[in-house]
Amino acid sequence: MVNVLINGYGSIGKRVADAVAKQDDMKVIGVTKTKPDFEARMAVEKGYKLFAAIPERKHLFEEAGIPVEGTLDDIIEDADIVVDGAPKKIGKANLENVYKKHGVKAIIQGGEKAGDAQDSFNSLWSYDRCYGKDYIRLVSCNTTGLCRSMYAINSVADILKARIVLIRRAADPNDVKTGPVNAIVPNPVTVPSHHGPDVVSVIPELDGKIMTSAVIVPTTLMHMHSIMVETSGTNRDEIIDALAKTPRILTLKASEGFDSTATIIEYARDLGRSRYDLNEIAVWEESVNVVDNEVYMMQAIHQESDVIPENVDCIRAMLEMESDNLKSIEKTNKAMGLIK
């Protein structure tokens, strides 16, 4: 049983904490918050030991009546690994100023740059490369989703060229500061977007073969990808079969009512998923087509949760708990109650 510390109990951190708590080979020894908000109070109510991420703010938790065990410095030495859930750029600072200082292994999230850590993690592609490493970046929700679908295609044919258009959600449901509310925004307006190079950080063999562009639209539920991949040769049945065999990919049919991201999220709700999380990505089966060996398909990504099982697998890889990535994936999925 290894000790996991969650530094930053926010959108990602609270989900990783719950996922780790469900495993039988790891435990959450504590979570941190920078301020005494409702998430901090709920962390304590769920049984997590709460620590102040910033020592000077410990008294704020006490004044708010939220039990706090101490500060980050009081618990970090007990951790075998830290999962950083801090906002973009803060993770890198934590890595340099906190984790390396204390000599503790750490996972930073996809908002940081590839060069900020020793490698970039995806359970299907880079588990072996990250095995035993000290500092790893867990790639973003979009990159995670693309890595899964590229894995499926690559299992039946060589990828010659990949072109992806990303239709990104404007903000998470709890974010009232981000937009747009009434616009479609190229983000970035230049091509390629950062997503292609980010995929290459996980799959180096796609260097020079992947091109991405991205726009932001006024929705909060999910991202969507329109994928076009030139291959060495395949057909629709092979791709459908490959998607079915690839972990953490669901093939859903519009003919059965899955005609939008809204109905996919409704499905997650009906499954009884906590926070309506869909850790699996969803591919519309009717969108899958192959013309002259070029694969076309559309997929949806739940931006708050598809990276969560990958964090668990990354812990096992970095702490050398399981050498077989597929066994780790299966173990994580079973504990979290994933469909596949």
Swiss-Prot record:
Keywords: Cytoplasm, Glycolysis, NAD, NADP, Oxidoreductase. SMART domains: Gp_dh_N. GO terms for molecular function: 4-hydroxy-tetrahydrodipicolinate reductase; glyceraldehyde-3-phosphate dehydrogenase (NAD+) (phosphorylating) activity; glyceraldehyde-3-phosphate dehydrogenase (NADP+) (phosphorylating) activity; NAD binding; NADP binding. The active site is at 141 (nucleophile). D-glyceraldehyde 3-phosphate binds at residues 140-142, 195-196. CDD domains: GAPDH_II_C (cd18127), GAPDH_II_N (cd02278). It catalyses: D-glyceraldehyde 3-phosphate + phosphate + NADP(+) = (2R)-3-phospho-glyceroyl phosphate + NADPH + H(+); D-glyceraldehyde 3-phosphate + phosphate + NAD(+) = (2R)-3-phospho-glyceroyl phosphate + NADH + H(+). One of its GO terms (cellular component) is cytoplasm. It is found in: Cytoplasm. The keyword Transport does not apply. NAD(+) binds at residues 11-12, 111, 169, 303. GO terms for biological process: glycolytic process; lysine biosynthetic process via diaminopimelate. Its EC number is 1.2.1.59. SUPFAM superfamilies: Glyceraldehyde-3-phosphate dehydrogenase-like, C-terminal domain (SSF55347), NAD(P)-binding Rossmann-fold domains (SSF51735). Pathway: Carbohydrate degradation; glycolysis; pyruvate from D-glyceraldehyde 3-phosphate: step 1/5. Pfam families: DapB_N, Gp_dh_C. Homotetramer. HAMAP family: G3P_dehdrog_arch. Belongs to the glyceraldehyde-3-phosphate dehydrogenase family. This is Glyceraldehyde-3-phosphate dehydrogenase. It comes from Methanococcus maripaludis (strain C7 / ATCC BAA-1331). The gene is gap.
